[in-house]
Amino acid sequence: MATTRKPRGGAGGATQPALDFDAPGEIVCGVDEAGRGPLAGPVVAAAVVLDPARPIVGLDDSKALSAKKRERLFDEIVAYALAYSVASASVEEIDSLNILHATMLAMKRAVEGLSVLPTLAKIDGNRCPMLAIRSEAIVGGDALVPSISAASILAKVTRDRMLVELHQQFPMYGFDAHAGYGTPQHLAALREHGPCEHHRRSFAPVREAFDLIR
């Protein structure tokens, strides 16, 4: 599990949109994940508490942004957020728990890694991990709630970077091009080379490729 976190000072006087702050004194963290669907690599989650005094322009669902915009916003989030935390669940955890429970585990780790204790976690999707604080699931939240948008960007960029590093070790799979998703290129490489230790053997295409070489 890789975790990064960042503390900052107190909040200023400006306000965020209503979706981010439900009541005076509420400290909201947005939570999102990247990497539920790929055949390889960890699932990564991020939690972000934005600073009302330092708004970040252009936040959106990471999937709606170009790679260049995600990288720029990643740097701004890291610089301006009150707190952020990025965590993951490993391929081994995905295979032993299943992808849903591994995703919930990564989200829990991200929230617990925050240096600022939130009072409410807003989670992208339709279910919440077990947390010690209140939580709210918001379908499509990564396009609606700025702190969830920020979390989606941190999770996506972090995971993409991880897969680029994996590509250096296993260039035959093309991880730098598809981030582990089941593209035709990736499936062809699986059939030709078989899976590596970073492939999720609980996922059917990987399991089938593994069976071919046994």
UniProtKB/Swiss-Prot annotation:
GO terms for biological process: DNA replication, removal of RNA primer; mismatch repair. SUPFAM superfamilies: Ribonuclease H-like. Its main location: cytoplasm. A divalent metal cation binds at residues 32-33, 124. It catalyses: Endonucleolytic cleavage to 5'-phosphomonoester. Its cofactor is Mn(2+); Mg(2+). Gene3D superfamilies: Ribonuclease H-like superfamily/Ribonuclease H (3.30.420.10). It is found in: Cytoplasm. Endonuclease that specifically degrades the RNA of RNA-DNA hybrids. Belongs to the RNase HII family. This is Ribonuclease HII. It comes from Burkholderia mallei (strain ATCC 23344). The lineage of its organism: Bacteria, Pseudomonadati, Pseudomonadota, Betaproteobacteria, Burkholderiales.
